[in-house]
Structure formats: structure tokens, C-alpha cells
Amino acid sequence: MSKVRSVGAVMTALLVACFAFQLNASMLSPALVLMEKELNTTAAMIGLTQTVFFTAAALFSLFLPRLGDMIGRRKLLTSMMVLTAVGCVISALAGVTGSVALLFIGRTIQGVAGPTVPLCLIMLRVAVPDPKRYGTLMGVITAINGGIAGVDAIAGGWLAQNFGFDSVFWTMAVIAVIAAFAVRFLTDESTVDQPQPMDWLGTFYLVVAVGSALIAINEIAKLQNANWLVVIGLIIAAAIFFMLFWRQEGNTEHPLVTRHYLSSRSTWALLLTTVLTMTGIFAIMNGIVPSIAQDTKFGAGLGADVVSFWTLTPYALAGLVMGPLAGTLAGRFGYRRVLRYGLIGALISLAILMFTMNGAAAWVLLLVSILAGLTYAGTVNIMLNGLGIVLSPSDNPGYLPGLNAGAFNLGAGISFAVLYAVMTSLGGGYGGHLGAIITGAVLLLLALGTSFLIPKAAGQPAAAS
């Protein structure tokens, strides 16, 4: 299809869309403690609402990018932003009514925004064919995954502290509506050269399989309170539906993902690395570090309205600054090499946090947040997203970015479930927070190991893969 919009217009729309998604993912971070109090519930329950959002985002990410290949990516992304706004309104009403159930419903609908970033990267690749320019702009867009210089976290903390947490959701809704208009009128429509019918039966099998596995993981995270009969039943269901999905993909003329692609290291090694990375660090930076900063017994004792200035803001700002540079470095030294250096740096940031968190001063948390922002948000995050694009086959460009987005959201959801469960099982306080951080570090170490299994991109020189 002919391109009539400028790259600047396309970038503007895509940045607004990514920011709208990021608000749903991180704007609530400094407000989680306040939400627990306003809704008269537990930290575990609030953490579960976060898990629900990321689980829904993971499930939608499994198939929406591929659907965009067929019906048009602009049309799909616009619809996603509209539905996200609806979910935000429902979540805001939960704050007005004090209903935790309504919050769960709203957060589930908001999860439709899950594959926003991969869709934007695919649309950007269509608009910017030059690899070097694309790499730099990709770094800018992907860095938004950490927030725009922490403005989202600052606003979230300030709004929650002064107007209640429902005001955070009203703000999200407004930005999502703006994003819908921007995408509709500032970008061009694009599809694959020969659109094919969607494999809806295969999609159903895959969503049920992954959904069952996610619910099982969330149940396991309850540790001694877990219902193990439910866990066993869900694991069996996940296995059965994945086998049905595998058979369907081998029998249908137009599979969602061919068996060959599913079994390649380009797919499973990348997805495993993404899940391990996100599980290891996401809840730490977006929940546990702000919790340490606000703790009055062993932490810095900061208020909800200023905690973001010391943690989430520098974390996001460092990631935003590093993103374009990381994209440039990837083109010179290779995505995989830069990814590994980033993971090592993220491990160092967690090690510093482990040894300094007891009685931690605000400046220590600031240092940790900056280092994690440079290494994870600005480097690892960019490399994992970039690999999802460069490892994708030309005949199915939406499948791997979509599955990778699902892996990002899956890992984020598991992160809140697992790390908060570890923290709770150890009694909270200093020991609980330390146990969660150690668990995260172990998971990051595993991610570093699996990163060596990711292959070079087909048709790419070694330095660019």
C-alpha cells in the first residue's frame, strides 16, 4: 500500500500508542500500596490484579499481531486502543465503588493492549526500510516500555496520593483515546502481501493451553495455600490443548504458526529468555523497589508522591536515554552480544540492591534504579524486542513478535505472582524483600544462560544478529 504519512507523523502516533500501553503497565506501581488501603484488601490481591492484566496481555499477544497481518495493522491497533480505554473506565469505576471484582474486569480488558509494542515495531519497519535508521527509531519506541522519563510513575503517584487511585485510570483512558485517534489519522494501513484466513481453531487451542498454564503458575505461587488438585488439572488441560494446537498446525492449510517455526531455536530460545528475564526483574523494579523505598522500618521511608522521583523516574529516564544507543550498538556488535552484556549489568544492579537494602538511603535506590534502567530497560528490553523482529520469517512477520510480546507479558505477570509470593512466604519485611530479590537474580542468571541458545538471524551477518 502507498505511504503518504511522513516518518515523523508515524513515529508520533506509534510513540503515543506505546505510551498508552505503558501507562497501563507501570503507572500504577507507586499506587499499589494505596490501592490496597482504599479497597480494603491485601497486597497479594492487588498483586493478583496486576497478574490478571499481564496474563490477559500475554494471551491477546499470541494472536493479535498475526490478525493484524491479515486485516490491517492500523485498523487493529486503533481498535486495541479503544478497547483499552473502555477497560480503563471500568477500572476507574472500581475505585469509585470500592469493588475489587470490577477492578479485575477492567484490568482484564486493558490487557488487549498487550501486543502494542510489536505491532508498532512492525508498522515502523514498513514505514522505515533503512536498517540503520530503523534500529535507532526501534530503540526509541522500545525504550517507552520503561515509561517516558518516568512521567507515568510520577503522575501515578501524585494522582493516587491527591485524588485516589481511580484518577490514575481516568488519565489512562484519556491517553488511550488520544492514541486511537493518532494511530488512525497519522499512520498508513499495512498487511502482508497475500493475506490468508486466520486459524481461529488453532488460536483457540493455543490461548486455552497458555491460559491454563498461566492460571496453574499463579496457583502454584500461593505455595502452602495452593490447591494442588486444581494445579494438576490445569497442567493436564494445558498439555492436552497444546497437543491439539500442535496437531491443528500440522493439518490446517493456513496455520497460525507452522510446526517448523515452533520447533526452531529462533522461537523457543528467544521466548524462554524473555520470560526468564521479565520474571526475574519486572516486579522488582516496578513493585519491590518502590516498596523498599516507602518502608519505614528498613527502607528509605519515602512517601508515595515522591518515591517515583528516586526509583521509577531515574529507571525510566536511563532506559529512554540508553535505548537509541543500544539499538545502534546492536547493529555494530550484534543483538545477542549486547543482550548478554545487558543481562550481566542487570544482575550487578540486583547484587548491589541485595547488599545495601537494609537501611538503604534514597541515593542507593537511585543508583540501583539508574543502573537497572541502563542495563535492562535500555538494553535487554530493546535487544529482546529487536530479536523478535529480525528472527521473524518474511512469510509470517507477526508470529514471533506476537509470541515474544506474549512472553514479555507472561513474564511480567509471573513476576508479580512468584516474587510477591516469595516475599509473603518469608513474612514480608526485610527478609521477604531480600528473598524476592535473590529469586529474581537467579532467574536473570538462567536468562543469561538461555540467551546463548538464541541463533543468529537468517540472512543476517554475524554482527547484526
Annotated model-derived regions:
Residues 59-98:
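Conserved MFS/SLC helix-loop-helix module at the cytosolic interface between two early adjacent transmembrane helices
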Residues 51-66, 118-122, 313-325:
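Central cavity-lining transmembrane alpha-helices of secondary-active solute carriers
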Residues 109-143:
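Cytoplasmic helix-loop-helix junction between adjacent transmembrane helices
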Residues 31-60, 99-105, 306-310:
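Extracellular/periplasmic helix-loop-helix junction of adjacent transmembrane segments
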Residues 34, 62-66, 70, 158, ...:
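Membrane-interface helix termini in secondary transporters
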